[in-house]
């Protein structure tokens, strides 16, 4: 019997529990067609206060989720769900559509990582298989997006819906804009991966140029549809190809 197994990694477990236990998803769990686990990321944090965030290197507003508790939570989830795809919900990710939801349903095992605050430390991406976005807008956290992924995939599992026609897809148009640049926070080195030197330099002009370059590169790589709509000045086109020593 086909079923979908998911583990949602979040700082706010109660935000997900209610939705997963209701309606079609609740019935799917009762029928054994959906197995949903919710993991509190703080269980993998250390110290009295189990801190999971810190200020971003290079300055800026907001806080960034630290790599240690997130990566350890992902590794523990992988041990529970061998072969699962690790999916980070992020505005920087590929757009969730019906085709991707079907891929998730067919794969059958997902670990969904919910971001918070200003984002997650870029070094966490080494433990992530893909990033997924539900649209060109920003939420206060990734929990709603993770629930969208579970809902969209679970309803494609045979037997979850009484009427298979209910799974018809809809299309949504995107809006123009750049994806966000990578974020980093303490420690300066994690498992051999170092924070880019420019973010530690204190040179705000270089930092802003680095962020602009990385945003342009991320958009070109992950959302070529958005990138194609941009009317970029020659300076941006040169910046995309510039090395760190040219910032």
Swiss-Prot record:
Gene3D superfamilies: 3.40.1280.10, tRNA(m1g37)methyltransferase, domain 2 (1.10.1270.20)
A single Gene Ontology CC term: cytosol
Domain of life per record: Bacteria
Broad EC category: transferase
A biological process term (GO) from this entry: tRNA N1-guanine methylation
Reactions it catalyzes: guanosine(37) in tRNA + S-adenosyl-L-methionine = N(1)-methylguanosine(37) in tRNA + S-adenosyl-L-homocysteine + H(+)
Positions of S-adenosyl-L-methionine binding: 115, 134-139
Subcellular localization: Cytoplasm
One Pfam family from the record: tRNA_m1G_MT
EC number: 2.1.1.228
GO MF, one annotated term: tRNA (guanine(37)-N1)-methyltransferase activity
UniProt keyword annotations, A-Z: Cytoplasm, Methyltransferase, S-adenosyl-L-methionine, Transferase, tRNA processing
SUPFAM superfamilies listed in its UniProt record: alpha/beta knot
Keyword Protein biosynthesis belongs to the record: no
Listed HAMAP family: TrmD
Self-association state and partner proteins as the record states: Homodimer.
Record family assignment: Belongs to the RNA methyltransferase TrmD family.
Function summary: Specifically methylates guanosine-37 in various tRNAs.
Descriptive protein name: tRNA (guanine-N(1)-)-methyltransferase
Origin species: Anaeromyxobacter sp. (strain K)
Gene (name only): trmD
